[in-house]
UniProtKB/Swiss-Prot annotation:
SUPFAM superfamilies: Epsilon subunit of F1F0-ATP synthase C-terminal domain, Epsilon subunit of F1F0-ATP synthase N-terminal domain. InterPro entries: ATP_F1_dsu/esu_C_sf (IPR036794), ATP_synth_F1_dsu/esu (IPR001469), ATP_synth_F1_dsu/esu_N (IPR020546), ATPsynth_dsu/esu_N (IPR036771). F-type ATPases have 2 components, CF(1) - the catalytic core - and CF(0) - the membrane proton channel. CF(1) has five subunits: alpha(3), beta(3), gamma(1), delta(1), epsilon(1). CF(0) has three main subunits: a, b and c. It is a peripheral membrane protein. Belongs to the ATPase epsilon chain family. One of its GO terms (cellular component) is proton-transporting ATP synthase complex. It comes from the Bacteria. Gene3D superfamilies: F0F1 ATP synthase delta/epsilon subunit, N-terminal. This is ATP synthase epsilon chain. Its main location: membrane.
Length: 141
């Protein structure tokens, strides 16, 4: 079966680089499924989970806090400020950070601060949801 090369890169490190049969990720207008030979595409992505079905049938799940997607017929590149492997997600930590952000929202004084905190809240909510869904024993529904 044909494969495509997938790179998921955060501001800090390369999170995944390898061959895959299929990639699913949260596009700006909904979920995107990418197969080998896909039409070239550049798009923003929303916070959520990137699911990679590796060439060996294994699966990688990576939380991204939004970013940019580039698709070429033989490759997929995901660039995100924050990308976290599913095994490293911590729902309790994300919920605690969300509580702090909600407090910051209550104290925000201007539109710029409010917009920044609302974006952070959306990312933290997506991170907590991804952690809950990808928790060992739950599967990736």
């Amino acid at each position: 079966m044909a494969t495509l090369h997938v790179d998921v890169v955060s501001a800090e490190e390369a999170i995944f680089s390898g061959e895959a049969k299929f990639v699913v990720l949260p596009g700006e207008s909904g979920e995107l499924g990418i197969l080998p030979g896909h039409t070239p595409l550049i798009s923003r992505i929303r916070p959520g989970t990137v699911k990679i079905v590796r060439a060996d049938e294994g699966e990688e799940n990576i939380f991204v806090a939004g970013g940019i997607l580039e698709v070429q017929p033989g490759s997929v590149t995901v660039l995100s400020d924050t990308a976290i492997r599913a095994a490293d997600l911590d729902e309790a930590r994300a919920l605690a950070a969300r509580e702090k952000a909600e407090e910051a929202l209550r104290n925000a004084k201007d539109r710029e601060d409010i917009a920044a905190v609302e974006a952070e809240l959306a990312m933290l909510a997506a991170q907590a949801l991804a952690a809950r869904r990808l928790r060992p024993g739950r599967g990736s529904h």
